[in-house]
Amino acid sequence: PDWSRGLGDVYKRQVCIRYGMSKWDQRFLELAKQISTWSKDPSTQVGCVVVGPDREIRSTGFNGLPRGIEDTSERLNNREIKYPMICHAEENAIMHAARTGISLKNCVAYVTWPPCTRCARSLIQAGVSEIVYPKEVEIPERWEADFDMSLNMFKESKTLVRKE
């Protein structure tokens, strides 16, 4: 649920400041949420915005099939077909940056879900130094162990993780 729905702008800023979320964190998380709506996955929509040290957007991504691969209902509604084929939002953002020659070193990744181990290793290897995701996200039980492992990967690699 969107905790800020229906709240005035002044109140939103006060809530964000009180809980340690800057207006920039709020903006980039909201943008990641908007980008997540571009996903055609019927069960999960995830968005990612990667931001440089000067608050410039370096790359964005959402979960979906690779370029040129038709996203049919049959593929998207069958996990056995979908999972091996789909690119996660973080992967899409990283691959888009690589495709266009943009460095993600020392950037912050704003994501609508905690990164899985697959995305954690990619974010770490890309040089992303901080991950921010909403604290109110409900995680399906089937993902809990994977997300716990990704948090351990981030901790060991000294990648900062913030739940906002």
Predicted regions and their residues:
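Single conserved hydrophobic/aromatic residue that forms the stacking wall/gate
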Residues: 1-14
